[in-house]
Amino acid sequence: DRLVSRGLGDVYKRQKRFGSAYAPLDESLSRVVVDFSGRPGLFWDVEFKREFINDFDLQLLEEFFHGFTNKALATIHVDNLKGANAHHQAETIFKAFALALKQACSMDDAKKDRLPSTKELL
């Protein structure tokens, strides 16, 4: 089940495949690296300063990333490098994730003339 390949259609064969990004917010800094390798794996290095933001259980963030990783068949590294405010930590993780996804799903200019086919022979 390739969530990303179905969503991107023919673009999938021409995408860059991996991306990385840092995102800051005040004292917090996070890094996310995404690789649509076909091998799911989540490497989570995040220690939130609190367990909840209001009523939201921050353990659900890791569960979200596990689900995405497994459905997208991607390897994802999530590292919160600095942070004193749990809200800022969570926000920088999602900002970095969005930027890394954008990069990984963008077209690779080296592959732009390649016609998508099952064996890339066309």
Which residues does each PLM region occupy?
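Buried hydrophobic positions in well-ordered alpha/beta secondary-structure cores of metabolic enzymes
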Residues: 1-2, 97
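Single conserved hydrophobic/aromatic residue that forms the stacking wall/gate
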Residues: 2-12
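Structural preference for solvent-exposed beta-strand-turn elements
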Residues: 10-122
